């Protein structure tokens, strides 16, 4: 299943809780979650986790080289590394570094290392998730440190690499929902609406209300440049 699913809703609606349940970080107090018809708690835990790549809001980078931060001990496929680095929008930054992929991500232990910005670290975490050969990709606000235009461009590129993978995205910026096959709208810890972008806009419900409110915000704050893309 290579369905691309976006999860949206107001703060506290249950979006991240839903993802934590999928990853077995929480156990359901009611009902069950099935994967291929099998309760997810019946899978061996480590085997289950190998099916997932994830990027959370509290992503981490380490005082290792750029290459090691992306591959994290996995076999190095140079072409694939270059591909995910470019898709994440980190290629120009790495090419500008004296040691390229060998540059240490921090000056904590190496004065020749490089300090990355929050947005650059987030891109590295995204590249790491894309590098892992997993069947399911989960991204919880993966682009929060990026501006709306950079996020829009990144999603457009990223989805190309996710062919053949089931993908879940949580985002407060609703324009990226246009790239997804399905949007789940959470409210009060339940799924209130379910459908593609066009269907939900025609429904004129909660999703349409949030989308239009956000588009109006961008029109005011970005002089129409972002809103033009979104509409």
What kind of feature is each model-predicted range?
Residues 148-150:
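Helix N-cap at the start of a conserved alpha-helix in ABC-type nucleotide-binding domains
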Residues 100, 156, 178-231:
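C-terminal portion of ABC ATPase nucleotide-binding domains
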Residues 23:
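Helix-to-loop junction immediately C-terminal to a conserved catalytic motif
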């Amino acid at each position: 299943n290579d369905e691309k699913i976006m999860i949206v809703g107001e703060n506290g609606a249950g979006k991240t809780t839903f993802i934590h349940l999928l990853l077995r970080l929480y156990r359901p107090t009611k009902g069950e979650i099935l994967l291929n018809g099998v309760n997810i708690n019946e899978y061996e835990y480590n085997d289950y986790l190998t099916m997932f790549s994830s990027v959370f809001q509290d992503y981490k980078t380490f005082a290792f080289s750029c290459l090691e931060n992306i591959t994290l001990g996995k076999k190095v496929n140079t072409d694939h590394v270059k591909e995910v680095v470019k898709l994440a929008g980190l290629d120009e930054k790495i090419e500008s570094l004296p040691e390229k992929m060998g540059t240490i991500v921090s000056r904590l232990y190496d004065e020749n290392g490089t300090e990355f910005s929050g947005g650059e670290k987030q891109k590295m975490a995204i590249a790491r998730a894309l590098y892992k050969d997993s069947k399911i990709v989960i991204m919880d606000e993966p682009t929060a440190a990026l501006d709306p235009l950079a996020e829009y461009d990144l999603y457009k590129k990223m989805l190309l690499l996710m062919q053949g993978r089931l993908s879940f995205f949580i985002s407060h910026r609703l324009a990226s929902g246009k790239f997804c096959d399905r949007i789940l709208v959470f409210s009060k810890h339940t799924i209130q609406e379910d459908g593609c972008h066009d269907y939900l806009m025609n429904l004129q419900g909660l999703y349409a209300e949030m989308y239009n409110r956000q588009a109006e915000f961008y029109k005011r704050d970005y002089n129409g440049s972002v809103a033009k893309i979104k509409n």
